[in-house]
Amino acid sequence: MIHEILPVGWLQCNCSVIGDPETREAIVLDPGDEVEKIAEILKRHKLKVKAIVSTHAHIDHVGGLKKLHELTGAPVMLHADDLPLYQAMDVQAAWIGMQPPELTEIHQLLKEGEALHWGAFEAQVLHTPGHTPGSVSLYVPQNAGKVTLPAPQLFAGDTLFAGSIGRTDLWGGSFEGILRSIRGKLLGLPEETVVFPGHGPTTTIGRERESNPFLQTQ
């Protein structure tokens, strides 16, 4: 697996480029900004983007969708419950004092349990609301499609962080909802699952299950 993580924009959203070294097909997760740097990674690995996925519709995760779609022609994917947030980009931009990015059409609405395929790889869509109503995580099992990985992988967006969880004080957030998502859908994954959050360092499900302070009490 080709996997490069690029922190983009002034909020340093972790954009992931995940490619199949054999077929050169790839998906790009959360291209929030700095599309020219994402393009450099794609060019260096000679990757063709099959899908552009946003784990949720906050401005720091979707700011580069239009440019990357125009560059690659790949469809843009988002959960339907975050469409109101996506369509309120001018409001989001005003919150943090920046110009709103140009928007592109959402070409495919992500659904719970849906499988995304690129090359020999497969990822399962998990609807994990709480940070936003339409937040999703992508789970890549160890036997991911036609290949075997060293460990399962979880691309958690802003739902689960190393030692923390996503904030829930913004529009559509729910503290109870995010805990329900994490406990109900994420903590039951294999403990060796490597977690790639939307910001900050990687972690594992086992580490968060054992020591994340937000997950130690009911």
Q: Language-model features: where?
A:
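Short Gly/Pro-enriched turn/cap motifs at secondary-structure boundaries
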Residues: L6-V8, E105-H107, H127-H131
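Metallo-beta-lactamase
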Residues: V91-W95, F121-Q218
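Short catalytic-loop micro-motif centered on adjacent basic/acidic residues
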Residues: I27-L29, A51-V53, V125-H127
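Active-site HxH/HxHxD metal-binding segment of metal-dependent hydrolases
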Residues: T23, D33-F121, P141-A144, P152, ...
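Hydrophobic residues in well-ordered beta-strands that form the structural core
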Residues: L29, V76-L78, A156, P197
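Conserved S/T- and glycine-rich ATP-binding loop of Class I adenylate-forming
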Residues: I18, T55, T128
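Conserved beta-strand hairpin/beta-sheet module of binuclear metal-dependent hydrolase folds
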Residues: M1-H45, S137-F155
